[in-house]
A protein has these predicted regions:
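Catalytic strand-loop segment that frames the active site of acyl-thioester-processing enzymes
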Residues: 1-32
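C-terminal output/interaction extensions
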Residues: 112-131
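Generic structural detector for well-ordered beta-strands
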Residues: 9-15, 66, 112-114
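Residues at secondary-structure transition points
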Residues: 31-35, 72, 116
Length: 131
């Protein structure tokens, strides 16, 4: 049973490779939104991982976030995901996600993940190449 309130927190230091300028999502050398989003998704995936059975995985299906403040290269950033609800069939899991740096909140929102059978999911994906 997936427990509401389960959390995972991740931490990393912003490098030049993690900037908006480097990824092409902006022109400035500040922590890029795509990297913040990925960090939030990673925290959610990790929070859910211990509840999965063998052969299962999870995939992101929705991410609704804001990126509200810049973070410079060299500063630490943190992301947290907390399970807020689970669908009746147990296959869809909602999270509250947030990110902050050493000076305060930089972003937040919600994220949804679907629990999938990994082999079946990949087989359906490969079918796309064959059609």
């Amino acid at each position: 049973m997936i427990l509401i309130g389960t959390k995972c927190q991740l931490e990393q230091t912003v490098t030049r490779e993690l900037t908006a300028e480097a990824v092409g999502s902006g022109a400035l050398p500040v922590f890029g939104t795509p990297f913040m989003a990925a960090m939030m998704e990673n925290a959610a995936m990790t929070a859910l991982q211990s509840y999965l059975e063998e052969g299962q995985g999870s995939v992101g299906t929705r991410l609704d976030i804001t990126h509200d403040a810049p973070t410079p290269v060299g500063m630490k950033v943190f992301a947290e995901a907390e399970i807020t609800s689970v669908s009746e069939n147990g296959r869809m899991v909602d999270f509250r996600v947030s990110a902050w740096d050493e000076k305060g909140l930089i972003g937040g929102g919600t994220h949804t993940r679907a629990i999938i059978q990994s082999e079946r999911f990949l087989a359906k994906c490969i079918e796309k190449l064959e059609k």
